[in-house]
C-alpha cells in the first residue's frame, strides 16, 4: 500500500509540474504578444507623404504652424494664414531622405489689400478688406526600386511619384478673424498604367486674441482619397478599390513676444483613425537676421509606442534692395530609418 501511495503521489506531482509548465508557457507567450508595440494609425493610411510637413521652417518647428501669423506663411498648415503674409513670399525646399526617397516643396503666397475710394485722401488709411492666395506643390517619390518578374529575373528599375497640388484662398473678415479654404488635387503614379488621382479640401479659421496670442482651428483632407483600377494590367482579374485619407481636425495656439523676439506655438490634432497628436514649436530671433527653431511632432497621446519626432532648424536672411533672400534648414529625427531627415530651403520675399 505504501508503494502504491508513493507511486500515486509521484504521478500527481509530475502531472502538476506538467500543467504548471504549460500555464507558464501560455503566460509567457501572452505577455510577449501583449508587449508588441502598436503601429501608428496615420503612418499606414493613404497620403502619408502629405502629412510629413511643408518646408524647412514648418518642419523645424515641429509642424505646429496653424496659429503662427509671422514670417513666410503657407496655407498647407492653415488656409486662413495667407491674409497675414507680408509681401510676396516664394518658398522651395529639398529633403535629404534615406532609402532612395524624395520629398520636395514649392509655394507662393500673397495677400491683397482692398481700400475704399472714400479713404483715398487719408495718408494712414487702412484696408477695408484683405484676401490671400497660396499656390503650392508637394512632390514625393521612391526611385531605384528593383523590378523583377514572376521568375525572379530583373525587369529594370521602377520609380513612384506622389504629388499634391493645392490652391488656398482666404479672407480677413475683421482685424481679428480670418477664414480660408484649400482645394487640393492628388496624383499618384504607382506603376506603368497604374495611377490614381483625387480631390480634397481643407478649411481653416484663425482668431487674433490680442497682440501676443492667436488661436486656430483646421479640418484637413475632407473627401481626399485615391481610386485604383488594376484592370489595365490584369484585365478581367483586375480590381477597383478606393483608399480614403484620414480626416484631421486640429486646434492650435500661437504666442509672439516682440520684445523677446520669440514665437511659440502648440497644436492638438485628432483624426478619424483614433490618433491624438500633440505638437510644439518655438522660434527665436537670436541675432539680427538669424532665427533658431525647435519643435516636437507626432507625440501621440493614444499610442505611446509610436515615437515622437524632435526637430531643430534655423534661417538666415539678407536684404538686397527690396528683396529679402533667406536660407532655411531643418533636421528631424526619423527613428526607423538608416538616417534622419534633412531639409534645405530657399525663400524669397519681395
Regions found by a protein language model. Give the residues of each.
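A broad structural signal for short, well-ordered beta-strand segments within beta-sheet-rich domains
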Residues: 1-2, 130
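Charged/polar low-complexity intrinsically disordered segments
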Residues: 2, 9-14
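Acidic, Ala/Val/Gly-enriched low-complexity intrinsically disordered segments
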Residues: 6, 22-26
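Hydrophobic transmembrane-helix microenvironments that flank and shape a buried ionizable site
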Residues: 18-19, 28, 75, 199
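N-terminal signal peptide c-region/cleavage motif recognized by signal peptidases
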Residues: 30-32
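Subset of outer-membrane beta-barrel
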Residues: 36-350
